[in-house]
């Protein structure tokens, strides 16, 4: 095991990696329930989507582990699945088979870009300070997702977002938000006390408290409002359902496809996936202290190749773009440093096929504390930004603030790259800007104009 994953070289142990892998899985297990609920709007079978999601995630995790030896987990990405279901199959009116084929082609393009070092060059072209900004921005973004998942932050017509009213719908929204607060303090206290597995313990403890609240009547099930039973229940699951989506991305006979539309769809998947993945790798790798003195990530080519392979494999199985998950940061926070962590996460995704009713019972308010706390850990990188150099700090600031407010890692990177080029040009520091940064800035601007 040590020889395969270089545990001693990375100052870790089997126990630490296993705990990290379990923690990562627990924080992203929600995708097993969320992805089918979104993609089923396209007409796909929800059971087939669940199986495709689990298997594609496992393939991605294994590829990341054995090709790159990184503790990064993969699964079908949120945002891209919504674009798949509601834009491509919804407003544009295309069959889900066409959408899957677009994802498959995108994956192939990614494989080519990874093998030809294009994606690696983009990663290395981003300035170190901007990478720090990406890491902080992802921390804020992850924390915001956690606050939303706990219903601590809710929508507001006047201010866009506001704090939850605990008294309104206390037995559903209120109690869940309160338990999330308690869970966050549990993790924080355990972390301060240097307890191993503090994040995982916090998730399980919050879930158990929720079950107790349900049994005592403090938490009430309201499926119509999205508040389900917290008590795991066994129900039959049709494992043959995946036959309804497997290989259907190639079954395009009789389907009308506008070539221009298809190119736009494929490029949209490609663009968002590329910079979401790069942003996640930058942020999580920075937190794990994996970047070298030049801000480069060793074995980045293999990591990007694993991501690309998982995308095409996922399309064949029957799911939208598979990408590196930002929730990997929770496992890194537990000490995960090698591919063994990813292997554990991958196996749990396979096991989840059998025990799907159990894993999909984990409530959002139980995993939210983990995301909120991981956000704190990632935001700590802000002290590494040199605020005395305004040509470096202003783009980093715009990058980190736009990620949570625009609810997108790729948009934050776009703003950061464009502002970096403009600020340094105006400041007379054009020599700092690499040719590839000019190209990226231009591509981002064109994206806002035409896509």
PLM regions with names:
Residues 40, 65, 69, 73, ...:
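Transmembrane helix-loop junctions in multipass membrane proteins, especially transporters and channels
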Residues 1-48, 166-167, 203-301, 445-446:
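Helix-loop-helix hairpins and the membrane-proximal interhelical loops
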Residues 2-35, 56, 77-86, 90-138, ...:
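Helix-loop-helix junctions within the multi-pass membrane cores of secondary transporters/permeases
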Residues 26-30, 67-77, 110-113, 194-195, ...:
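Short helix-coil transition sites and intra-membrane helix breaks within transmembrane domains
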Residues 43-62:
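Loop-to-helix transition at the N-terminal end of transmembrane alpha-helices
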Residues 37-48, 87-98, 256-262, 361-363, ...:
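Helix-coil boundary and interhelical linker segments in multi-pass alpha-helical membrane proteins
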Residues 60-73, 189-191, 268-276, 307-317, ...:
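Transmembrane alpha-helix interface/packing and boundary motifs in multi-pass membrane proteins
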């Amino acid at each position: 095991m040590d020889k395969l994953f270089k545990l001693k070289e990375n100052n870790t142990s089997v126990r630490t990696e296993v705990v990290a892998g379990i923690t990562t899985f627990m924080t992203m297990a929600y995708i097993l329930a969320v992805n089918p609920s979104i993609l089923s709007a396209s007409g796909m079978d929800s059971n087939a989507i669940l199986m495709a999601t689990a298997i594609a995630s496992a393939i991605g995790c294994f590829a990341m582990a054995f090709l790159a030896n990184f503790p990064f987990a993969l699964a079908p990405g949120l945002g891209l699945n919504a674009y798949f279901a509601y834009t491509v199959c919804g407003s544009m009116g295309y069959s889900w088979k066409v959408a899957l084929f677009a994802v498959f082609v995108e994956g192939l393009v990614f494989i080519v870009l990874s093998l030809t070092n294009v994606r690696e060059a983009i990663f290395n072209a981003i300035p170190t300070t901007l990478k720090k900004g990406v890491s902080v921005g992802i921390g804020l973004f992850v924390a915001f997702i956690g606050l939303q998942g706990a219903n601590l932050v809710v929508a507001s017509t006047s201010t866009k977002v506001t704090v939850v009213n605990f008294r309104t719908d206390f037995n559903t929204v209120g109690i869940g938000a309160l338990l999330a607060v308690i869970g966050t303090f549990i993790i924080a206290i355990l972390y301060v006390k240097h307890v191993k597995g503090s994040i995982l313990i916090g998730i399980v403890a919050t879930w158990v408290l929720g079950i107790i609240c349900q049994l005592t009547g403090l938490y009430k099930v309201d499926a119509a409002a999205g508040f389900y039973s917290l008590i795991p229940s066994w129900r039959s699951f049709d494992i043959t359902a995946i036959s309804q989506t497997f290989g259907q991305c190639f079954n395009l006979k009789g389907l009308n496809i506008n070539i221009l539309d298809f190119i736009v769809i494929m490029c949209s998947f490609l663009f968002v996936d590329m910079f979401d993945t790069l942003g996640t790798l930058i942020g999580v790798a920075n937190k794990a202290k994996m970047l070298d003195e030049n801000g480069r990530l060793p074995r980045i080519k293999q990591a990007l190749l694993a991501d690309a392979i998982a995308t095409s494999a996922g399309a064949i199985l029957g799911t939208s773009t598979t990408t590196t998950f930002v929730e990997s940061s929770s496992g890194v926070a537990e000490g995960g440093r090698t591919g063994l962590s990813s292997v554990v996460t991958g196996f749990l995704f396979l096991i989840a096929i059998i025990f799907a009713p159990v894993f999909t019972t984990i409530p959002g308010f139980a995993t939210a504390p983990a995301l909120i706390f991981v956000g704190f850990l990632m935001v700590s990188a802000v002290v590494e930004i040199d605020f005395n150099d305004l040509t470096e700090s202003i783009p980093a600031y715009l990058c980190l603030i736009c990620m949570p407010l625009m609810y997108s890692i790729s948009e934050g990177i776009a703003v950061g790259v464009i502002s970096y080029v403009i600020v340094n040009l105006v400041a007379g520091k054009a020599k700092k800007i690499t040719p590839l940064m000019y190209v990226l800035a231009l591509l981002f601007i064109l994206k806002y104009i035409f896509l």
